[in-house]
Amino acid sequence: MSIVTKSIVNADAEARYLSPGELDRIKSFVSGGERRLRIAQILTENRERLVKQAGEQVFQKRPDVVSPGGNAYGQELTATCLRDLDYYLRLVTYGIVSGDVTPIEEIGVIGAREMYKSLGTPIEGITEGIRALKSGASSLLSGEDAAEAGSYFDYVVGALS
C-alpha cells in the first residue's frame, strides 16, 4: 500500500484529516515520483540486456542447471528461466514506480516459492538471478537510484528465500 493510500486509510479510520506529518510524507513521496519513473524507465529500456547478463551469470555459476537433467537444460527451459528473470525485473519496476512492495506481493511472489519447489526448481538459482539483475541495474544507476531499486530486488529475494 502506497504512503498516500496508507495515510488516507489511517486518517479515515480515525475520522480525521491528514496530519501535517502525513502531508509531509505524501509531499516527499510525490516529489520523488519523477525519480522513481526515471529509474523504472532505465531498467525497462535495458531489460533485455539485464536479463541476458543475469542469465549468463547464473548459468556460469551454476552449470548444473544448464547441464542434461538441469532445470534450464535445452533451449526451451533456458528461455523459461530467462522469462522468469524478466518477470521479476518487471515486478521490481512496478514496485519502484509505486514506491511500495504491494504490487510485487500481490502480482508475483505470493506462492512463487511453493511453485518452484513443486517443480523442483532450485530457489537458489532464481535468487542468484535476481541478485545478478540487481547488480546489472546498479551499474546503470547513480548511487541513490541504485539503492532505491536495490531495495525492491532485495525484497523479491527475501520473499522467495
Swiss-Prot record:
Highest rank taxon of the organism: Bacteria
Record's comment on post-translational modification: Contains one covalently linked bilin chromophore.
GO terms, biological process: photosynthesis
Induction data: Constitutively transcribed in vegetative cells, not expressed during hormogonia differentiation in red light.
UniProt topology in membrane: Peripheral membrane protein
Keyword Electron transport belongs to the record: yes
Entry keyword set: Antenna complex, Bile pigment, Chromophore, Electron transport, Membrane, Methylation, Photosynthesis, Phycobilisome, Thylakoid, Transport
SUPFAM superfamilies, A to Z: Globin-like (SSF46458)
InterPro entries linked to this entry: Globin-like_sf, Phycobilisome_asu/bsu, Phycobilisome_asu/bsu_sf
Residues reported to bind (2R,3E)-phycocyanobilin: C81
GO CC field: phycobilisome; plasma membrane-derived thylakoid membrane
Keyword field contains Transmembrane helix: no
Signal peptide: none
Localization (cell): Cellular thylakoid membrane
Pfam families xrefs: Phycobilisome
Annotated positions of the N4-methylasparagine modification: N71
Family: Belongs to the phycobiliprotein family.
Function: Light-harvesting photosynthetic bile pigment-protein from the phycobiliprotein complex. Allophycocyanin has a maximum absorption at approximately 650 nanometers.
Self-association and partners: Component of the phycobilisome. Heterodimer of an alpha and a beta chain.
Protein name: Allophycocyanin alpha chain 1
The encoding gene: apcA1
